[in-house]
A protein has these predicted regions:
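Solvent-exposed, well-ordered amphipathic alpha-helical segments
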Residues: 1-3, 22, 50-52, 96-99
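Short, flexible surface segments
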Residues: 36-39, 47
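Compositionally biased, charged N-terminal/linker segments
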Residues: 1-37
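Cell-wall polysaccharide-cleaving catalytic domain and substrate-binding groove, primarily
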Residues: 38-42, 92
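Short coil-to-beta-strand transition motifs
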Residues: 43-54
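A generic structural signal for short, non-catalytic loop/turn and secondary-structure boundary residues
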Residues: 1, 46, 86-88
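A generic structural signal for short beta-strands and their flanking turns/coil linkers
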Residues: 24, 47-49, 91
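Aromatic- and Lys/Arg-enriched surface recognition patch
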Residues: 55-99
Length: 99
């Protein structure tokens, strides 16, 4: 039985669109989810896809995150609230569909 990977429901379609278009996607994990997912492991997405973790990068400052300039201020603040402001790291995870 595969473990599940979670996403906010409002992101389901955009994640699937990225996977269809690029073959991979990224997610950011903070606070209690740091360390939960492992490179090379597969997880069940809420919409039924099996997703494989390809790479995990750990950061301490939101400004160090790749594609930071593409994020909204609200997204940056959400990550900062549960990582940088608490003195904790966060993870930037690349994943793809498992074939």
């Amino acid at each position: 039985m595969l473990e599940k990977i979670t996403f906010p429901e409002h992101e389901y379609q955009s994640v699937q669109d990225w996977l269809n278009r690029q073959g991979y996607c990224y997610t950011t994990r903070v606070y209690k989810e740091v360390g939960k997912y492992k490179v090379g492991e597969s997880y069940l997405a809420p919409w039924g896809d099996i997703l494989r973790i390809d790479e995990i990068q750990t950061y301490r400052k939101v400004s160090d995150r790749p594609f930071c300039d593409e994020m909204s201020d609200a997204e940056k603040e959400e990550i900062r609230k549960y990582s940088e402001d608490m003195g904790l790291p966060y993870e930037f995870i690349r994943f793809s569909r498992s074939i």
